[in-house]
């Protein structure tokens, strides 16, 4: 039996009848029991970068170039590119950036592709 708070006690499903006797021996009655708990989880990419630092869109959304051409662009074409510095950008954004500068936009280290794709 795990106590979360002084007023709340979680009781596993099989121990409900034995805990009635135990709780009757306690002088202070509990306010409520949790009989069922449905946990919810959220899945996310295991990367620290949530937004592309160049276009400021979420890294898993379309970049601004693909949003402008949304009729012809698909999410498969708008992929993520990682550098050896572990910074991630939309491939279209970093490609445009690399035409003028061969460095990472965030740490100014020489850019080299580490990984490309979803």
From Swiss-Prot:
Keyword Transmembrane: no
Binding site for Zn(2+) 3: 85, 87, 104, 107
SUPFAM superfamilies per UniProt: RING/U-box
N-acetylalanine: residues carrying this PTM: 2
Record key words, sorted: Acetylation, Cytoplasm, Metal-binding, Nucleus, Ubl conjugation pathway, Zinc, Zinc-finger
Pathway(s) this gene product operates in, as recorded in its UniProt entry: Protein modification; protein ubiquitination
Keyword check for Mitochondrion: no
Tissue: Widely expressed. Expressed in shoot, siliques, meristem, flowers, floral buds, open flowers, leaves, stems, roots, germinal seeds and seedlings in dark. Expressed at a higher level in tissues containing actively dividing cells.
PROSITE patterns reported in the protein's UniProt record: ZF_RING_2 (PS50089)
Binding site for Zn(2+) 2: 63, 66, 78, 92
Record's protein name: RING-box protein 1a
Organism the protein comes from: Arabidopsis thaliana (Mouse-ear cress)
